[in-house]
Amino acid sequence: MPEPSKSAPAPKKGSKKAVTKAQKKDGKKRKRSRKESYSVYVYKVLKQVHPDTGISSKAMGNMNSFVNDIFERIAGEASRLAHYNKRSTITSREIQTAVRLLLPGELAKHAVSEGTKAVTKYTSSK
């Protein structure tokens, strides 16, 4: 059995961007599955708020779990609201109402304001 070459460094543990191809026994190459995460976006926001601060991979994992959890809660609540109102489409109105129901006080106000701003920016760029 040939020895693995030492020239190419092994991918870091926990690396999310695995696009290299793994070698199979029969010689065929297969792509590794891509692991989706919000880490790029969390990092961009961190640098906007605190440019001189870093984040550990464990903390990034926690942030990724947090974003996924909030996303699922908002989507679930918006789906319920659409169902209650006999609608088959989740619109920005359902999302906004779901955010108001799920997030407490001032946080909900800021989230709605930022969401409205993002939707306005998106529609004006079309």
From Swiss-Prot:
Main location: nucleus
CDD domains referenced in this protein's UniProt entry, alphabetically: HFD_H2B
Pfam families for this protein: Histone
Positions of post-translational N6-lactoyllysine modification: 6, 12, 16-17, 21, 24, 44, 86, 109, 117, 121
Protein name per its UniProtKB record: Histone H2B type 1-N
UniProt modified residues of type N6-(beta-hydroxybutyryl)lysine: 6, 12, 21, 35, 117
One GO MF term attached to the UniProt entry: protein heterodimerization activity
Modified residues (Omega-N-methylarginine): 87, 93
Record PTM N6,N6-dimethyllysine, positions in chain: 58
N6-succinyllysine, modified sites: 35, 117, 121
Residues modified to N6-(2-hydroxyisobutyryl)lysine: 6, 13, 21, 24-25, 35, 44, 47, 58, 86, 109, 117, 121
Location of the protein in the cell: Nucleus; Chromosome
Domain of life, source organism: Eukaryota
Comp. bias intervals (Low complexity): 1-12
Species assigned in the record: Bos taurus
Sites of N6-butyryllysine modification: 6, 21
Modification type N6-crotonyllysine: residues: 6, 12-13, 16-17, 21, 24, 35
This protein's encoding gene: H2BC15
Residue positions, PTM N6-methyllysine: 47, 109
Glycosylation sites recorded in the entry for this protein: 113
